[in-house]
Protein backbone atom coordinates (compact mmCIF):
# COMPACT_ATOMS: atom_id res chain seq x y z
CA UNK A 1 0.00 0.00 0.00
CA UNK A 2 1.66 3.25 -1.15
CA UNK A 3 1.80 6.13 1.28
CA UNK A 4 3.94 9.26 1.64
CA UNK A 5 4.41 12.51 -0.22
CA UNK A 6 4.94 13.23 -3.90
CA UNK A 7 8.32 11.78 -4.99
CA UNK A 8 8.92 10.38 -1.44
CA UNK A 9 6.96 7.15 -1.26
CA UNK A 10 6.69 4.83 1.71
CA UNK A 11 4.95 1.49 1.58
CA UNK A 12 3.03 -0.62 4.07
CA UNK A 13 3.34 -4.38 3.83
CA UNK A 14 -0.12 -5.69 4.64
CA UNK A 15 -2.28 -8.81 4.52
CA UNK A 16 -5.33 -8.15 2.35
CA UNK A 17 -8.29 -10.29 1.33
CA UNK A 18 -8.07 -10.98 -2.43
CA UNK A 19 -11.60 -9.65 -2.97
CA UNK A 20 -10.76 -6.18 -1.63
CA UNK A 21 -9.48 -3.39 -3.87
CA UNK A 22 -5.74 -2.72 -3.88
CA UNK A 23 -5.68 0.23 -1.48
CA UNK A 24 -8.74 -0.91 0.48
CA UNK A 25 -9.09 -2.09 4.04
CA UNK A 26 -6.36 -4.48 5.12
CA UNK A 27 -6.51 -7.32 7.64
CA UNK A 28 -3.08 -7.01 9.26
CA UNK A 29 -0.10 -4.67 9.07
CA UNK A 30 3.01 -6.81 8.58
CA UNK A 31 5.66 -4.13 8.14
CA UNK A 32 6.73 -1.10 6.18
CA UNK A 33 9.29 -0.06 3.57
CA UNK A 34 10.91 3.35 3.13
CA UNK A 35 13.06 3.28 -0.04
CA UNK A 36 14.38 6.82 0.60
CA UNK A 37 16.49 5.68 3.57
CA UNK A 38 20.06 4.47 3.06
CA UNK A 39 19.89 1.80 5.81
CA UNK A 40 17.05 -0.12 7.47
CA UNK A 41 14.71 0.47 4.56
CA UNK A 42 12.45 -2.42 5.48
CA UNK A 43 10.97 -3.39 8.85
CA UNK A 44 8.90 -6.57 9.01
CA UNK A 45 7.21 -8.13 12.03
CA UNK A 46 8.41 -11.71 11.50
CA UNK A 47 5.90 -13.31 13.86
CA UNK A 48 2.92 -11.75 12.08
CA UNK A 49 4.36 -12.47 8.62
CA UNK A 50 5.03 -16.14 9.44
CA UNK A 51 1.56 -16.47 10.96
CA UNK A 52 -0.09 -15.26 7.74
CA UNK A 53 2.19 -17.34 5.51
CA UNK A 54 1.33 -20.44 7.53
CA UNK A 55 -2.37 -19.62 7.15
CA UNK A 56 -1.90 -19.75 3.37
CA UNK A 57 -1.34 -16.11 2.43
CA UNK A 58 0.40 -15.71 -0.93
CA UNK A 59 2.92 -12.84 -1.05
CA UNK A 60 3.42 -10.83 -4.22
CA UNK A 61 6.73 -11.16 -6.05
CA UNK A 62 7.97 -7.89 -4.56
CA UNK A 63 7.05 -8.86 -1.00
CA UNK A 64 8.60 -12.31 -1.49
CA UNK A 65 11.80 -10.55 -2.58
CA UNK A 66 11.73 -8.41 0.58
CA UNK A 67 11.16 -11.53 2.68
CA UNK A 68 14.16 -13.17 0.98
CA UNK A 69 16.38 -10.15 1.67
CA UNK A 70 15.50 -10.22 5.37
CA UNK A 71 15.82 -14.02 5.63
CA UNK A 72 12.16 -14.50 6.48
CA UNK A 73 11.34 -16.52 3.35
CA UNK A 74 14.10 -19.04 4.18
CA UNK A 75 12.65 -19.47 7.69
CA UNK A 76 9.21 -20.06 6.20
CA UNK A 77 10.44 -22.65 3.68
CA UNK A 78 12.43 -24.48 6.37
CA UNK A 79 9.41 -24.58 8.67
CA UNK A 80 7.36 -26.17 5.86
CA UNK A 81 9.88 -28.95 5.18
CA UNK A 82 8.86 -32.22 6.73
CA UNK A 83 11.32 -35.03 7.42
CA UNK A 84 11.02 -37.81 4.86
CA UNK A 85 10.47 -41.24 6.40
CA UNK A 86 12.90 -43.81 5.04
CA UNK A 87 11.36 -47.09 3.99
CA UNK A 88 13.14 -50.30 4.88
UniProtKB/Swiss-Prot annotation:
HAMAP family: Ribosomal_bS16. GO terms for biological process: translation. Belongs to the bacterial ribosomal protein bS16 family. This is Small ribosomal subunit protein bS16. The lineage of its organism: Bacteria, Bacillati, Mycoplasmatota, Mycoplasmoidales, Mycoplasmoidaceae. Gene3D superfamilies: 3.30.1320.10. One of its GO terms (molecular function) is structural constituent of ribosome. NCBIfam families: S16.
